[in-house]
Regions:
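A Rossmann-like FAD-binding core segment of flavoenzymes
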Residues: 9-17, 25, 32, 99-171
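Short beta->alpha linker loops
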Residues: 62-65, 87, 140
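Rossmann-like NAD(P)H-binding beta-loop-alpha module
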Residues: 69-117
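FAD-binding core/adjacent interface of flavoenzyme oxidoreductases
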Residues: 2-81, 153-171
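Short glycine-/acidic-enriched loop or helix-start segments at secondary-structure transitions
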Residues: 48-50, 92-93, 115, 147
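A general structural signal for well-ordered alpha-helical segments in protein cores
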Residues: 47, 67, 89, 122-126
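ATP/adenylate-binding site constellation spanning eukaryotic-like Ser/Thr protein kinases
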Residues: 43, 55, 85, 118, ...
Length: 171
């Protein structure tokens, strides 16, 4: 498909980009010319420095495999805590809300999607979530995650503890 559109896919480490010559200099000496350039550098999930975040019932949602593992646990009436209500967190939130799980969202900023939305828009999203039975906690941090019985207890910065069958990190 890409070849039909005249698009080349090149993987490698980039040493420099010469915009004047429309060239990318790759590590190892190869130079690749371009008409238009898209750099897709990829990324990796950030693991927050929270006690217990390495527990097997705590998952990031970064890959299709992660999403499948989460959907196996997030069933109706299970308790799920979602850490992070940014753009990606809200996409995950929607899927979790549809699962029928009892969903609690923890966002350390004062509103949902804080990097993209002002107070009004962030609060509209919060109201929408709460109207669908999602508990949203803003200006709150997860302090620790501990195993209790067969599940987890999530301790928050306001002193509350929330039971969880699964914690999803979208930080």
């Amino acid at each position: 498909h890409y070849k039909e559109l005249g698009i080349s896919h090149v993987e490698g480490l980039v040493d420099s980009i010469n915009q004047e010559k429309s060239e990318v200099n790759l590590h190892g000496g190869t130079t690749v010319g371009y008409d238009r350039l898209l750099v897709a550098s990829g990324s990796t999930p950030v693991t927050p420095p929270i006690e217990g975040v390495d527990h097997p019932l705590v998952s990031s949602c970064w890959t299709l495999e992660d999403a499948r593992r989460i959907s196996e646990v997030a069933k109706p009436n299970t308790d799920v805590v979602l850490m992070g209500a940014g753009f990606i967190g809200c996409i995950i939130l929607e899927a979790l809300a549809k699962s029928g799980a009892n969903l609690t969202v923890i966002e350390m900023e004062d509103r949902m999607v804080p990097r993209m939305m002002n107070d009004t828009a962030g609060n509209l999203i919060k109201d929408w979530c709460e109207s669908r039975g999602v508990s949203v906690n803003t200006s709150t941090r997860v302090e620790s995650i501990t195993e209790v019985g067969g599940g987890l207890s999530v301790t928050l910065s306001d002193g509350k503890s929330i039971p969880a069958d699964l914690v999803v990190s979208a930080t």
